């Protein structure tokens, strides 16, 4: 396949597939061991098998910590890491822009505004999650109403997304300015910085299906995503319905991002850093790239969350850590590899 740039990168080798499959699982097991209450890897593995076979002692302190606190956090961290990485990769290909992120079309800002409004009016976590997701979708619809139309290019959508994102960010600032400084403002501020502290099985049941369906659809059509990086005339020559492909890609990536942000707040860098890292290692071919983004995104976010909840007495906001870890790592990676181009 040719285009602006050749889609470099062959099919993943069997060894690479095994490593990408095992890596997040190993990191997840280690994350279950780490925390203020230390649990040995052997005990964690025993507990997992006991849960599967129905022989687990669910009343013990270690079991309660494992299954009621750490497990839902790790599941959510893995889903969010994979989801934001896949969304970032999709948007970068869709807009042929290496700086595109899941917030390019304003979805993160809209979701944050929805959460801020819900928290301002005293909604519980589940309602906040639902309202945040709804406003994320509304933000994307506004972006496409403003940026799409006859004779308009994808750059118009990007510019509209920047404007809509700025509008919702300003509205969030307004909500914070009128919120009660003692009870409401700290909750909004901490939520906006990202945290998995509110993870639970009920919230996962609400948000996880959206993420999983979105990622599954993008995974199934991953080979077609290579076509998005071609000029329009070459893309049409392949016989693919480009408008339909773009629509499906945007809908899936938007739904994934809105669901991620609605469950844990705004998490920066993941949707930019992980796709770049995977492109540098595995090339631009989405057949290999998307599975790599899923695995590396899960691994990265589980590690970040483990540090966030274990490094200090007070939990560190996720976005702080992703920036502190991501920015230097990304700079080093760019200097060593020379970057990548679509």
Regions found by a protein language model. Give the residues of each.
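Alpha-helical transmembrane segments in inner-membrane proteins
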Residues: 2-342
């Amino acid at each position: 396949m040719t285009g602006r740039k050749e889609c470099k990168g062959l099919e993943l080798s069997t060894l690479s597939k095994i490593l990408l499959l095992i890596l997040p699982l190993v990191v997840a097991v280690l994350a279950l061991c780490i925390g203020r209450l230390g649990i040995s890897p052997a005990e964690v593995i025993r507990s997992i098998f006991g849960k599967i076979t129905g022989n687990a002692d669910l009343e013990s302190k270690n079991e309660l910590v494992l299954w009621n606190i750490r497990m839902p956090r790790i599941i959510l961290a893995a889903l969010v890491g994979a989801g934001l990485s896949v969304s970032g990769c999709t948007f970068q290909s869709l807009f042929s822009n290496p700086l595109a992120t899941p917030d390019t079309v304003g979805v993160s800002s809209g979701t944050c505004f929805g959460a801020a409004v819900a928290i301002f009016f005293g909604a519980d976590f589940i309602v906040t999650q639902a309202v945040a997701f709804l406003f994320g979708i509304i933000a994307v619809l506004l972006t496409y109403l403003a940026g799409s139309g006859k004779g308009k290019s994808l750059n118009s959508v990007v510019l509209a997304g920047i404007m809509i994102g700025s509008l919702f960010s300003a509205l969030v600032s307004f909500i914070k300015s009128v919120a009660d400084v003692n009870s409401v403002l700290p909750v909004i501020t901490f939520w906006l910085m990202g945290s998995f502290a509110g993870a639970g099985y009920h919230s996962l049941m609400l948000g996880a299906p959206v993420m999983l369906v979105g990622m599954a659809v993008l995974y199934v059509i991953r080979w077609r995503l290579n076509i998005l990086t071609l000029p329009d005339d070459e893309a049409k020559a392949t016989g693919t319905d480009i408008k339909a492909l773009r629509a499906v890609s945007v809908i899936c990536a938007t739904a994934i991002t809105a669901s991620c942000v609605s469950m844990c707040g705004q998490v920066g860098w993941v949707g930019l850093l992980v796709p770049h890292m995977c492109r540098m290692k595995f090339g631009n071919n989405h057949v290999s790239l998307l599975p790599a983004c899923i695995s590396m995104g899960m691994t990265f976010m589980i590690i970040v969350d483990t540090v966030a909840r274990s490094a200090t007495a007070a939990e560190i906001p996720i976005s702080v850590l992703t920036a502190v870890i991501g920015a230097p790592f990304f700079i080093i990676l760019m200097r060593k590899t020379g970057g990548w181009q679509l």
